[in-house]
């Protein structure tokens, strides 16, 4: 088929099998409907098929002039109705309807991705088919809801990972306008197993044949991080070499199969951040390459992200690239004023993605990116702060958006005003108060408007200019509840309103810095030893403070070094309270007035040493009653 702004044709092909005991005289008609429902064109042909035989047909329309092009912004669909009749009686024997769209695209190592002849940045999301408590058995409406949520955020591209998903998902991609990468599940390692190659071939052919009519699909994928586990498990050359040879042979074979099935779309693989894929020859097989990059999460630092991309581009300038995965985990119970990698705080995920997204948007040779993942999803082998959950999602498992969702919405939705106080994930706050002075805590706003004014309990805190779709105010907290409101002038002409507003109520618990001169009767001081994060328990709403060094008249640790672990803590839902410690601590001191106090200790053995006695207060010789 051929398509341009001036004209386009539709190629219709298929098979008809005559299961009857006598020959069949048939009439096959194809009717093409414009997006508005009017008939654009029809084709008829007479067919004669002998008993038990199969007939393959192939018909191409004459040019349809000035076709309405399919894009994520204007997903115009043409309907192709195929009707099979008995030629003599005109009885309808079979009938089918398929939707298609007119669009063309290209990938280029220097210019990135183009759609219908124009540069187009792929703003994407990876998506697993999963939701608590039903697992992968989502209903059609759940699939449709996910695409609606992605579109509302401003996404135009989805990586359907790592396996073909329900037809309802692709139908919604076609209808609402979402470009798609679909792939078959080949991961971890290519085994020396009889029938493995044939099974992979069959999976690839089935996926393409089932879904090739969808105009949303632009690339077919196979293999995800195929060398990651291979290189971890096999270090010796004599062990690694045959596996790499099998992997390369399988990739070459699948590329041939893919091109046999579909020459109108491009092929791709997703690599983890290792140049080994290029060194062994995998990088030159597919039309485009995807990079799964996590600099600043699984090691390294944030700026390593753009450095890696630049290195790859310099070495292989003709390779079109997509960043097929990037992301950081977040647990809404964890918050930090000094976030760092792998603390699972909401704030570090925001910091990470606020660094990555501008790189993707501003680097012309990058075709686009797909954030990993759209949802918090089940992951059987994970421990971390939320066992069995990969929590890198932009929305929670129940599809409630995290605050970071609105950063993407502010960046990607230039057609509407976006203003969101990014504190829905941190509504119970706490802080150390010096005397009667208010506690200053940051409040962030995501917006695509140039300037924001913030109010606390009706009092203006002034205005700030937006930078990277975010504004952060230092807000004074001093009472149990505050109402925070944001206001911005609407510069988006699409909506006839002068100002955009958002508001939220935040709870606050002050903790006195000077314990010695304070009435502590109602004080509940909870400390997460060794942690830099605030932790609010789902079960009690109690907020545990980050650890701090001892100060006179206050409280804190004496000596030791902060350590952490990501192992699952059993028999509790408050795992993050037990995953940090101070190794070699000399003491913990509270300068409190004379009186009677209740002290609770929470213990676990994160080093799995199974010590018989972890701690017994009565055995310490320096205990003072």
What do these predicted regions represent?
Residues 143-146, 165, 169, 196, ...:
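Stable alpha-helical elements in mature extracytoplasmic
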Residues 158-166, 189-198, 274-277, 296-307:
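Acidic-and-aromatic substrate-binding clefts and catalytic sites of carbohydrate-active enzymes
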Residues 1-162, 172, 177-180, 203, ...:
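Secreted/periplasmic carbohydrate-active enzymes, especially glycoside hydrolases
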Residues 8, 17-21, 216-221, 227-230, ...:
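Substrate-binding clefts and catalytic carboxylate motifs of secreted carbohydrate-active enzymes
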Residues 504-625:
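Compositionally biased, intrinsically disordered or flexible polar/acidic segments
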Residues 120, 170-176, 207-215, 280-283, ...:
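Acidic (Asp/Glu)-rich catalytic clusters
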Residues 172-176, 195-200, 204, 283-284, ...:
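Short low-complexity, flexible loop/linker segments enriched in glycine and/or proline
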Residues 101-106, 125-129, 159-172, 184-188, ...:
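Short, solvent-exposed turn/loop segments enriched in Gly/Ser/Thr/Pro and often Arg
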């Amino acid at each position: 088929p051929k398509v341009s702004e001036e004209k386009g044709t539709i190629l219709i092909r298929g098979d008809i099998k005559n299961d009857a005991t006598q020959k069949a005289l048939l009439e096959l008609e194809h009717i093409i409907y414009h997006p508005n429902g009017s008939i654009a064109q029809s084709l008829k042909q007479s067919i004669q098929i002998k008993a038990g035989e199969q007939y393959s047909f192939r018909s191409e329309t004459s040019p349809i002039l000035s076709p309405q092009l399919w894009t994520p912004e204007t997903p115009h669909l043409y309907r192709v109705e195929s009707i099979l009749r008995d030629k003599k009686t005109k009885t309808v024997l079979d009938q089918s309807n398929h939707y298609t769209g007119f669009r063309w695209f290209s990938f280029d190592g220097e210019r990135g991705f183009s759609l219908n002849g124009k540069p187009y940045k792929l703003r994407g999301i990876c998506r697993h088919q999963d939701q608590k408590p039903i697992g992968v058995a989502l209903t059609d409406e759940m699939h449709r809801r996910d695409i609606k949520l992605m579109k509302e955020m401003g996404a135009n591209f989805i990586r359907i990972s790592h396996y073909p998903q329900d037809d309802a998902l692709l139908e919604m991609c076609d209808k609402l306008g979402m470009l798609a990468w679909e792939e078959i599940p080949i991961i971890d390692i290519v085994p020396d197993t009889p029938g493995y190659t044939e099974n992979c071939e069959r999976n690839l052919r089935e996926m393409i044949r089932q879904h090739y009519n969808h105009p949303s699909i632009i690339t077919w994928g196979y293999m995800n991080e195929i060398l990651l586990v291979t290189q971890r498990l096999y270090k010796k050359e004599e062990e690694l070499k045959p596996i790499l040879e099998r992997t390369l042979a399988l990739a070459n074979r699948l590329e041939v199969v893919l091109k046999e099935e579909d020459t109108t779309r491009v092929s791709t693989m997703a690599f983890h951040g290792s140049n080994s894929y290029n060194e062994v020859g995998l990088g030159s097989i597919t039309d485009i390459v995807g990079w799964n990059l996590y600099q600043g999460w699984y090691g390294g630092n944030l700026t390593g992200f753009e450095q890696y991309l630049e290195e790859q581009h310099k070495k292989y300038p003709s390779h079109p690239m997509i960043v097929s995965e990037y992301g950081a985990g977040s647990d809404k119970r964890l918050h930090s004023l000094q976030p760092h990698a792998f603390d699972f705080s909401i704030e570090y995920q925001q910091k990470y993605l606020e660094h990555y997204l501008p790189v993707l948007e501003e680097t012309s040779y990058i075709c686009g990116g797909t954030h990993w993942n759209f949802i918090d999803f089940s992951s059987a082998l994970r421990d971390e702060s939320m066992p069995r959950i990969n929590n890198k999602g932009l929305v929670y498992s129940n599809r409630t958006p995290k605050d970071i969702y609105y950063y993407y919405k502010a960046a990607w939705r230039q057609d509407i005003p976006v203003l969101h106080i990014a504190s829905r994930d941190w509504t119970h706050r706490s802080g150390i108060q010096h005397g009667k002075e208010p506690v200053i805590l940051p409040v962030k706003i995501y917006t695509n408007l140039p300037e924001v004014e913030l109010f606390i309990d009706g009092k203006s805190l002034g205005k700030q200019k937006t930078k990277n779709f975010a504004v952060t105010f230092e807000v004074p907290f001093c009472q149990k509840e505050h109402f925070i409101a944001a206001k911005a002038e609407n510069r988006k002409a699409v909506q006839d309103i002068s100002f955009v507003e958002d508001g939220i109520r935040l709870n606050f618990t002050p903790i006195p810095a000077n314990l010695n001169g304070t009435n502590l009767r109602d004080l509940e001081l909870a400390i997460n030893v060794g942690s830099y994060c605030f932790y609010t328990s789902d079960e009690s709403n109690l907020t545990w403070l980050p650890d701090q060094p001892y100060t006179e008249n206050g409280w804190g640790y004496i000596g030791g070094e902060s350590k952490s672990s990501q192992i699952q803590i059993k028999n509790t839902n408050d795992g993050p309270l037990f995953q940090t410690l101070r190794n070699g601590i000399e003491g913990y001191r509270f300068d409190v007035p004379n009186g009677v106090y209740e002290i609770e200790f929470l213990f676990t053995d994160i080093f799995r040493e199974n010590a018989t006695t972890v701690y017994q207060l009565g055995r310490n010789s320096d205990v003072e009653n």
